């Protein structure tokens, strides 16, 4: 990775400098400051009017006895990186310095990246091709994992984003299993982070974890939501008109403050894509998320007495693949009947990517009374920009405890799948919610969940050979490093 040219930064990005300043100046304790450690050449590359870097303890590494720092305040001279870290660990620095940042140059960064004391790496990822003559090695992803990645921005014609990686294993040895195989991971059950608490991150970075969008929304609903009755008789607290946005470029938004049933998310989405409305197909795979709405008792209670148990009616998959076809039962052959919205979406993305009508809708008013449950996540629009595919989904009714973690993952997964089919990269998933509600019976469980600190989101790997939306099977998908907190039980309101 290039970091310099002719002893200076090879790009002019005010946003990059602001990010650097914000992350190295900001402290949680206002009585403390951070230390920035740099080599002599890095110090000399800073314009005279800006050095020493204000609001920080400047630690300069040099073996030159003739080095003159003009008796500047907030400047300390050390002969090596080790001696600098030892000094900062002693009084008075250990009492006044909150965090230590290694900021350059190239050789010092190369020493630091794999050092056991390196807890996190914060970098600006430049996506444009820019000539450099100073480099650092790539991030070792066997030890570090993305925590936060900003949405890409373009400044002075240069596309870039800000990324923070956290150490999740203590050493290279611990990033391997007993057989020596690297745990960068197909089997997420085997991968446990050696580091469990990530509060060592700067507060501004720690709180940018995208899971906080969900946690903060749940907290806001519980504290400030309107108390309402609902069709299940359970009662809710709710808010109207909410939005969350997730970045799909580096990791996958599967919540970590509780274990989300990933296999259920995956199998349900493949079931939707197949056009099936038979809940027994999922039951046979050990997926019981639709059992409550497919039972004999429930179908009878909503007047579908003639409907076979397990037959959900013309729900999501049917509308995606056969919109407008006459629904009879879950056993009928609907091939070639109705309008295949999913294939239409894919065709438009491939052949008319600027179309503003790339829509997938499960809301069909003429079929609502035939459905075991009218669509909650009902409308998705896709958007193509600079080789990336983004999706915005509208959800009329959102069960924040049980449904929303599933919905975030499901539509993020759908976006990633369609992107691959269309030779694009995943961009954003935007989740827009009408009635965002917490069932009163879920409040205690959600309060437990809100006490948990997020862990890094996993990374999703999809079999790159698959280019047909109907060809995907469960073995085509692998989660890398999903290590959530334990499962939190919540009972579904039916």
UniProtKB/Swiss-Prot annotation:
Its EC number is 1.5.1.3, 2.1.1.45. InterPro entries: DHFR-like_dom_sf, DHFR-TS, DHFR_CS, DHFR_dom, Thymidate_synth/dCMP_Mease, Thymidate_synth/dCMP_Mease_dom, Thymidate_synth/dCMP_Mease_sf, Thymidylate_synthase. Residues 1-167 form the DHFR domain. The keyword Oxidoreductase applies. The keyword NADP applies. Keywords: Methyltransferase, Multifunctional enzyme, NADP, Nucleotide biosynthesis, One-carbon metabolism, Oxidoreductase, Transferase. The active site is at residue 376. One of its GO terms (biological process) is methylation. Substrate binds at residues 16, 103, 124. NADP(+) binds at residues 2-8, 40-42, 61-64, 104-111. Gene3D superfamilies: Dihydrofolate Reductase, subunit A, Thymidylate synthase/dCMP hydroxymethylase domain. Coiled coil: none annotated. Residues 170-494 are annotated as: Thymidylate synthase. Bifunctional enzyme. Involved in de novo dTMP biosynthesis. Key enzyme in folate metabolism. Can play two different roles depending on the source of dihydrofolate: de novo synthesis of tetrahydrofolate or recycling of the dihydrofolate released as one of the end products of the TS catalyzed reaction. Catalyzes an essential reaction for de novo glycine and purine synthesis, DNA precursor synthesis, and for the conversion of dUMP to dTMP. In the N-terminal section; belongs to the dihydrofolate reductase family. In the C-terminal section; belongs to the thymidylate synthase family. NCBIfam families: PRK01827.1-3, thym_sym. This is Putative bifunctional dihydrofolate reductase-thymidylate synthase. It comes from Oryza sativa subsp. japonica.
């Amino acid at each position: 990775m290039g970091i310099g040219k002719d002893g200076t930064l090879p790009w002019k990005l005010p946003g990059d400098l602001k990010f650097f300043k914000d992350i190295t100046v900001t402290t949680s304790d206002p009585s403390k400051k951070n230390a920035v450690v740099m080599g002599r050449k890095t110090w000399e590359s800073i314009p005279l009017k800006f050095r020493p870097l204000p609001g920080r303890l400047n630690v300069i590494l040099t073996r030159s006895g003739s080095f003159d720092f003009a008796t500047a305040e907030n400047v300390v001279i050390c002969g090596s990186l080790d001696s600098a870290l030892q000094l900062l660990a002693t009084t008075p620095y250990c009492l006044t310095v909150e965090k230590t940042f290694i900021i350059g140059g190239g050789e010092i960064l190369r020493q630091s990246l794999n050092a056991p004391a390196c807890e996190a790496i914060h970098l600006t990822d430049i996506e444009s091709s820019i000539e450099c003559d100073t480099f650092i090695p790539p991030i070792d992803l066997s030890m570090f994992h993305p925590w936060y990645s900003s949405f890409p921005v373009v400044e002075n014609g240069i596309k870039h984003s800000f990324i923070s990686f956290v150490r999740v294993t203590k050493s290279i040895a611990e990033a391997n299993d007993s057989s020596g195989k690297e745990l960068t991971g197909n089997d997420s059950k085997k991968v446990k982070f050696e580091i469990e608490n990530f509060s060592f991150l700067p507060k501004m970075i720690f709180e940018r974890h995208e899971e906080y969008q969900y946690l903060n929304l749940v907290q806001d609903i519980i504290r400030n939501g309107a108390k309402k009755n609902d069709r299940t008789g359970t009662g809710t607290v709710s808010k109207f008109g909410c939005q969350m946005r997730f970045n799909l470029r580096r990791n996958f938004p599967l919540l970590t403050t509780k274990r989300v049933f990933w296999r259920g998310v995956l199998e349900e989405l493949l079931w939707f894509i197949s056009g099936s409305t038979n809940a027994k197909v999922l039951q046979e795979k050990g997926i019981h998320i639709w059992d409550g709405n497919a039972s004999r008792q429930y179908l009878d209670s909503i007047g579908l007495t003639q409907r076979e148990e397990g037959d959900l009616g013309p729900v999501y998959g049917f509308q995606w693949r056969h919109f407008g076809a006459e629904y009879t039962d879950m056993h009928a052959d609907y091939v070639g009947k109705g309008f295949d919205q999913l294939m239409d979406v894919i065709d438009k993305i491939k052949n008319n990517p600027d179309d503003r009508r790339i829509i997938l809708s499960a809301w069909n008013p003429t079929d609502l009374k035939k459905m075991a449950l009218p669509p909650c996540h009902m409308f998705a629009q896709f958007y193509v920009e600079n080789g990336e595919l983004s999706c915005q989904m509208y959800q009329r009714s959102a069960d924040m405890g049980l449904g929303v973690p599933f919905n975030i993952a499901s539509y993020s997964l759908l976006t990633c799948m369609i992107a691959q089919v269309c030779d694009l990269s995943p961009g954003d998933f935007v989740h827009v919610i009408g009635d965002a509600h917490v069932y009163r019976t879920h409040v205690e469980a959600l309060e437990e969940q809100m006490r948990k600190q997020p862990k890094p989101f996993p990374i999703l790997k999809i079999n790159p050979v698959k280019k047909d939306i109907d060809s995907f099977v469960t073995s085509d998908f692998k989660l890398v490093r999903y290590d959530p907190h334990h499962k939190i039980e919540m009972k579904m309101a039916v």
